[in-house]
Amino acid sequence: MRFLFLLFIVFPAIEIGIFLFLGNLIGILPTVLFMILTGIIGAAAAKKQGTEVYYKVQRDLQYGKMPGEAIADGLCIFIGGLLLMLPGFLSDLAGACLLIPFTRGWCKPILFKWLRGMSKNKRIIIK
């Protein structure tokens, strides 16, 4: 329940505050253009990296390897691309962290821990 409160009340309020602050600091037009630009860059980066991960999964499967790492990368890229396309500066920061391979390495253990927790709680079943 606290997570939903943060997601739907606190997070948008912080985003609106950042919009207002930057709108006053650099102006409305640059702020809006920056949001549009991050959405376009996010979509392009997610498409490029997503295609690379797709080929990596195929290659791993051809060699008989489990593509777990590549699938985790793909999930991070997908979520990162979505976050970059959402309007907001915090979501852009989180999305960029998921798209940059160096910082994605920090996020993947959190993703794996969350998935293991979901599996243990029987919320998702991994077979």
From Swiss-Prot:
Location in or out of the cell: Cell membrane
Keywords: Cell membrane, Membrane, Transmembrane, Transmembrane helix
Coiled coil (UniProt feature): none
Pfam families noted in UniProt: FxsA
GO CC annotations, alphabetized: plasma membrane
InterPro entries linked to this entry: FxsA (IPR007313)
Protein name: UPF0716 protein YtzA
Organism: Bacillus subtilis (strain 168)
Gene: ytzA
